[in-house]
Amino acid sequence: MTNTLWRYGRVLAVLWMAASCSLFAKAETLLWGGHPEFGIELEEEKSPDGTGLTHSITYIPALVFPNGPINRFDLLLMDEREQETTDGVVAKTNITKVALRVRKNIRFGGDWGMYVRALVGHANTPSERYNYGYTDLALRYEHDFFGFIAGVRVQRSLDGTPGHDRNKFRLGPSFDIGEHHELEFRWVRAWDAHTHAREADATILEYTYKF
């Protein structure tokens, strides 16, 4: 995991420097009034029995509309490296995904609120291609630079491809670092939507630059 994070960290540094160029700093005036953001998400997922391990990196260019009917539009570009061990034999698989996601924020007053997100995406593996989607519902607390969410995700295959229906529980803190930077940490537990067997636990680190 350390080597993986090191490689991803170098990618993050290069992209952060590129994002600082004046071309992107002026993008807000060209994007229908939305505020551009760019995120990088690193995830490690492990199966309960230790036979499965997945590392992934996701690039997330986004437009944020604080007062719009939809508050956020994300494009997710994902690259996964999946490793399965069976009887001592290790099989590795590369998975690529592309998805669109929207988010609506709902405020309760004070520091409390919630959000609803919906995603549709397409996944490509050496053995199959499938369409999938999910819906997130999360309770959110925000005070000054600190935030915390706890919520659920319902994920389903959209074309009947088996093996991709999951329910997830997600929680973790976030930290605003100055005006332009945000760090999010998430812990996720996933269950098979049909058998209710626990499938995986994941840890996620996401960095977002706000233009």
Question: Where do the PLM segments sit?
Answer:
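Residues that define the transmembrane beta-barrel architecture of outer-membrane proteins
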Residues: 51-59, 92-98, 129-135, 163-169, ...
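Cleavable N-terminal export/targeting peptides
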Residues: 1-35
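Outer-membrane beta-barrel architecture
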Residues: 58-64, 99-104, 136-140, 172-174, ...
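Transmembrane beta-strands of outer-membrane beta-barrel pores
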Residues: 40-48, 77-85, 96, 104-106, ...
